[in-house]
């Protein structure tokens, strides 16, 4: 890492205040098995050094030293070296000092941890020299601090063993501050609340306060408290929150400016005031409660603007303390919409991680969470069982969970979801990991005001996390909506009435239907009749779904035909008509769906139901299909009891087959997991984190013929039966890879499903896949898929040329000191005058990409205007080189995709082509073509180029290819094999289904 100390090998001149003869720099290597010293290293500033396992010789080398200095020696080395060195030398530890004096550095390990000098790994002399170099830098950094801050740190930390040696070594004066709070206020009055309990924190949490002050003084927007500090001083984040995000009742200047929600609303979103409902300031109340650290349950009317009430506090808190807010949402489309809406406002601090993302997008989103770039993370409740999500959140400080559609907790709600019941367990895991009595606040949002649902939500968090939810509710009515029920005789009459409504509509319309098939059929019929419409459903092709949604929101298409997966969080205020082609499954769903009309309260909108008595039968049939019966759960319980281990990993398919259940593939996963949830609620089992395994990420052959040749040439497959079995497995994988998205469903590469479909035992499938890797048929080359338009590929050069010209224009603006302030419209006019096919959206797309790629350090857009401020620490030469490399890579990738589109089997009459390719192979091909290029190109550069092509619309990245096993981790709690799952255990689910029937009625 560039910001780590350089290696010092010769004589070193320490600051004049330090006697060079009094300090030795040391490091010890200790066997973790025996706890005995196996190697020692030491050096002195005059150039003398020691490297041996001889303890007596080491003691002699250190003789006469008043101080021994090393990295992490107080917590580690000294417990082994104190018996050797005696009580004489005082330790000086560079690790806690590094975190205090270089708070912007994320990591504080020595260079060996970066694996850059492999020949020096575990070399204690090398580490001692690095500690000496780091100590020099720390002394220099300390001397650059204002004198009053030096003395303040000394006063707070001089009695702590990890810091005492440093201050004594530097002979820092140790004043006794009668009023440390006053000193801090004078230093940082504009950066923290002057009414915070500074005196109390200085007494109770001196180290944490020191780290917090250092961070506040030095940090920039993307910085986070170093993980080492959070691990070893876990209360630091709480101290930071107390200083910077706890509004005082007295209203100090800092709190008035930085913690006032109305000021924040204007600064982040450009609004002067919050919305009210029947003169109730519900939005403002919810935002203030969150800023005040309260847990809450807010009942908002559909279209009531709830998003801003949790986005605003999250953005304010993230800016001031780098805390992360996690938003749990059941719909992937909602997450995408909300993140894109924030991006369109110039807010780049929100990301989502969901199944619609390509592997590159997912990887970048995780990076943004870990690095501190993101302050808002949107995920689905099922993602909480992902170990990678847990690991990412453990590296940040989550201070609030926002639960959207909170009625999903309750069996009395219209959309009970078992995945919601794991939320409290996950929050508890994080709290336990953070330690220091860390409490994570919760904000729940729902549109249902059913008292039983509200009680269930409050009871859940009270019983599971000890949280009291403040209830905020309004009885506001949507006065700009009118409702009609239109009776229809048959399907022909239904369609005719729909056409009449659409022809008379004064603006955009949403038509809700019951099934995915109906969305496509009805949209096609309307378009054929001259009423252009697009389809939208949760299980549609991701590219088509996204394109259709974008076209409707942008006003390019007037009508969208959708299932109820569409609409939540969609920022379209001018919808004038919502038609339920079929009745909704519940009154709550109907209120929510119809409420997507007329979000602009100045517009009148219609909500119509086309109703026939037979419609009810359709809903009852769907309910019967999805119902989980008592007998189903009993069979799943019997299957679990048949497993010998108390704790084990098993996939939903394996468990269903073991139970003798033949579910439809689309329902199997949900039904099995619901059955496990029922058993967990009743205390029979405990389900914890998922246990996935990935066996390969690419197929290294282009055809089954090539695969057979490699298999037959390999000695790993001894018999003809083994070879045939291997060919069958590879053929399925190749078919799955090449068929990705062509059938509107994901590639089937799960090992348990492969075993089931091919009639081969799962252990045998896994064994064959291992041999296929050894034979070079399967690799880890990151196969991925993309949908491209032949038309778009032809015009790609022009599109990329436009972006290249825009980037050149931006770089010229940034050349003066790495900062630029400009107006988007004016910049666009300048680009147009220069002959570029520019528009403001393209400029915004480019800016957001450059920010995400790390080429821009800061980007601020004045809310409600087109004014933008940019800051970069890159030189003009670096920016130009990065732009040129990306342009070359993009051009190469486009030509490669053109060749694939022309040569591939998918080259039919359709404009859209589904392609599979490997990012690693693209890198190899590019390096082979560009072997004379001086600048080395990495896999990340290729991924960045693919991401750029995706964001500029040249291609649409889809999911990756993985041969995997998706296991659930289960543990039996009830160990009595005679115990049966009983009717009284099923009561909660029985009530849920009774409620569903009642809701249809």
Where do the PLM segments sit?
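Acidic, Mg2+-coordinating catalytic module of metal-dependent nucleases/exonucleases
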Residues: 110-202, 212
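C-terminal helicase lobe
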Residues: 505-519, 524-535, 544-564, 570-1001
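Conserved DEDDh/DEDDy metal-dependent 3′-5′ exonuclease domain
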Residues: 41-142
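Interdomain "pre-motor" coupling segment immediately N-terminal to P-loop NTPase/helicase cores
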Residues: 201-259
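Two-metal-ion RNase H-like nuclease active-site motif
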Residues: 21-31
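N-terminal cofactor/phosphate-binding cores enriched in small/glycine residues
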Residues: 31, 36, 40-43
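Helicase motor core with emphasis on the C-terminal RecA-like subdomain
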Residues: 252-269, 281, 285, 291-307, ...
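N-terminal accessory regions of nucleic-acid-interacting proteins
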Residues: 1-21
């Amino acid at each position: 890492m560039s910001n780590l100390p350089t290696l010092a090998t010769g004589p070193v001149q320490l600051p004049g205040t330090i006697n060079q003869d009094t300090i030795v720099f040391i490091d010890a290597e200790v066997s973790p098995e025996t706890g005995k010293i196996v190697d020692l290293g030491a050096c002195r500033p005059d150039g003398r050094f020691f490297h041996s396992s001889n303890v007596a010789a080491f003691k002699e080398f250190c003789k006469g030293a008043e101080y021994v200095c090393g990295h992490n020696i107080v917590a580690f080395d000294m417990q082994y070296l104190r018996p050797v060195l005696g009580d004489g030398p005082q330790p000086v530890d560079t690790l806690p000092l590094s975190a205090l004096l270089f708070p912007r550095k994320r990591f504080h390990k020595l260079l060996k941890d970066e694996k850059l000098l492999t020949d020096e790994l575990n070399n204690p002399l090398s580490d001692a020299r690095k500690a000496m170099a780091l100590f020099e830098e720390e002394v220099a950094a300390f001397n650059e601090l204002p004198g009053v801050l030096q003395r303040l740190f000394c006063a707070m930390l001089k009695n702590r063993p990890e810091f005492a040696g440093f201050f004594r070594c530097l002979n820092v004066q140790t004043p006794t501050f009668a009023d440390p709070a006053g000193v801090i206020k004078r230093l940082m009055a504009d950066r923290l609340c002057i009414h915070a309990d500074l005196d109390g924190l200085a007494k109770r949490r001196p180290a944490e306060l020191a780290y917090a002050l250092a961070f506040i003084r030095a940090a920039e927007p993307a910085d986070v408290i170093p993980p080492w500090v959070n691990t070893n001083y876990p209360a630091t984040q709480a101290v930071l929150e107390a200083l910077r995000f706890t509004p005082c009742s007295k209203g100090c200047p800092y709190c008035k400016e930085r913690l006032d929600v109305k000021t924040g609303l204007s600064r982040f979103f450009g609004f002067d005031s919050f919305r009210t409902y029947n003169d109730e300031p519900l939005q403002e109340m919810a935002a203030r409660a969150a800023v005040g650290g309260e847990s809450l349950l807010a009942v908002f009317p559909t279209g009531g603007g709830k998003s801003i009430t949790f986005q605003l506090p999250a953005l304010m808190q993230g800016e001031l303390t780098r805390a992360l807010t996690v938003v749990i949402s059941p719909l992937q489309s909602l997450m995408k919409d909300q993140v894109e809406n924030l991006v369109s406002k110039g807010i780049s601090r929100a990301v989502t991680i969901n199944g619609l993302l390509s592997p590159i997008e997912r990887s970048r989103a995780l990076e943004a969470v870990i690095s501190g770039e993101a302050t808002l993370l949107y995920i689905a409740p099922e993602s909480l069982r992902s170990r990678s999500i847990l690991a990412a959140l453990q590296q940040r400080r989550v201070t609030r969970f926002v639960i959207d559609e909170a009625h999903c907790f309750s069996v009395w709600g219209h959309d009970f979801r078992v995945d919601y019941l794991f939320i409290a367990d996950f929050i508890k895991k994080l709290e336990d990991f953070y330690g220091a009595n860390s409490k994570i606040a919760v904000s729940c949002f729902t549109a249902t005001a059913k008292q039983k649902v509200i009680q269930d939500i409050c009871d859940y968090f009270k019983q599971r996390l000890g949280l009291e939810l403040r209830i905020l509710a309004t009885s506001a009515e949507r006065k700009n909506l009118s409702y009609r029920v239109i009776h229809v005789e048959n399907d022909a009459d239904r369609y005719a009435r729909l056409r009449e409504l659409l022809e008379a509509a004064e603006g955009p319309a949403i038509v809700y239907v019951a099934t995915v098939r109906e969305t496509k059929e009805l949209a096609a019929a309307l378009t054929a009749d001259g009423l252009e419409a697009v389809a939208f459903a949760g299980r549609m092709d991701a590219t088509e779904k996204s394109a259709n949604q974008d076209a409707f929101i942008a006003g390019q298409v007037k009508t969208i035909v959708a299932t109820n997966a569409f609409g939540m969080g969609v920022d379209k205020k001018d919808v004038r008509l919502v038609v339920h082609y079929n009745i909704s499954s519940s009154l709550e769903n109907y209120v929510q769906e119809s409420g997507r009309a007329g979000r602009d309260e100045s517009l009148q909108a219609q909500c119509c139901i086309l109703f026939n008595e037979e419609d009810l039968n359709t809903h009852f049939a769907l309910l019967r299909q999805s119902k989980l019966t008592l007998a189903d759960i009993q069979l799943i319980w019997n299957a679990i009891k048949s497993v010998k281990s108390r704790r084990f990993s098993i996939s939903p398919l394996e468990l269903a087959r073991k139970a003798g259940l033949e579910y439809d593939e689309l329902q199997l996963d949900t039904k099995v997991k619901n059955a496990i949830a029922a058993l967990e609620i009743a205390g029979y089992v405990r389900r914890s984190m998922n246990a996935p395994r990935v066996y390969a990420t690419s197929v290294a052959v282009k055809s089954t013929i090539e695969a057979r040749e490699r298999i037959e040439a390999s000695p790993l497959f001894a018999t003809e039966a083994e070879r045939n079995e291997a060919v069958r497995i590879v053929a399925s994988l190749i078919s799955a890879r090449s068929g990705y998205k062509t059938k509107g469903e994901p590639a089937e590469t799960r090992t348990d499903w492969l075993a089931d479909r091919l009639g081969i035992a799962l252990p045998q499938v896994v064994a064959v896949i291992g041999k296929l890797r050894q034979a070079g048929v399967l690799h880890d080359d990151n196969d991925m898929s993309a949908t491209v338009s032949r038309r778009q590929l032809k015009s790609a050069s022009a599109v990329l040329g436009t972006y290249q010209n825009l980037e050149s224009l931006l770089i010229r603006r940034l050349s003066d000191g790495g900062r630029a302030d400009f107006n988007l419209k004016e910049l666009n006019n300048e680009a147009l005058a220069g002959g570029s096919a520019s528009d403001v959206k393209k400029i915004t797309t480019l800016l957001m990409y450059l920010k995400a790629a790390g080429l821009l350090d800061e980007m601020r857009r004045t809310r409600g205007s087109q004014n933008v401020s940019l800051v970069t620490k890159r030189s003009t030469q670096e920016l130009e080189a990065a732009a040129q490399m990306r342009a070359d890579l993009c051009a190469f990738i486009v030509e490669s995709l053109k060749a694939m589109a022309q040569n591939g089997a998918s080259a039919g009459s359709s404009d859209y082509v589904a392609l599979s390719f490997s990012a690693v192979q693209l890198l190899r091909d590019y390096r082979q073509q560009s072997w004379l290029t001086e600048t080395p190109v990495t896999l990340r550069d290729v991924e960045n180029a693919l991401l750029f092509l995706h964001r500029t619309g040249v291609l649409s990245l889809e999911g990756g290819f993985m041969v995997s096993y998706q296991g659930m981790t289960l543990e039996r709690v009830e160990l009595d094999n005679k115990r049966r799952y009983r009717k009284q255990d099923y009561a909660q689910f029985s009530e849920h289904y009774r409620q569903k029937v009642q809701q249809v009625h």
